[in-house]
Amino acid sequence: MEKIWSNLKVYIFSGDDLSRINRKSILQGLKNLQKSDGSFMASKEEQGCDMRFVYCAASICTLLDDFEGIDTEKMTEYILKSQTYEGAFGQSPGLEAHGGSTYCALAALAMLGSLENLNQHVKDRCQKWCSLRLNEAFNGRPNKQDDTCYTYWIGKLILILFPSYKYL
């Protein structure tokens, strides 16, 4: 799935209008990769599923402007079940909160148009978790070193949670 996402992005960056893309085939493939809990597998061969593939699926549907082939309600439920007591999101329900998976979760919710449906308490908990990641830069989870990668993910989260800061 990530290869499809990457290729679509390259086409778009190259100025392609995606008119040559077999949208129906891509969307059918996504539908076949969605599991009954709303998550997505990377491929039929790689049975693992986590928030990265939920993000990729939402992004592919956004790029193709078509969410009809997937169960967006189940997808949203899966994302929300992955929120931890800390307010951030794990790769899957019950897993540790992580900067990258939190970005994938909130970005997917934004693409689904479901971010506005989060209550303020949920947003506040996530905002607090993000602010606790700051030392000299951001880390991706408690008791970890600051890292350029996580500084990017947490920085992007701030833009998702506070869109008025889009030019920071």
Range-by-range predicted roles:
Residues 1-19, 42-70, 85, 90-125, ...:
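An alpha-helical repeat/solenoid feature that recognizes helix-turn-helix modules
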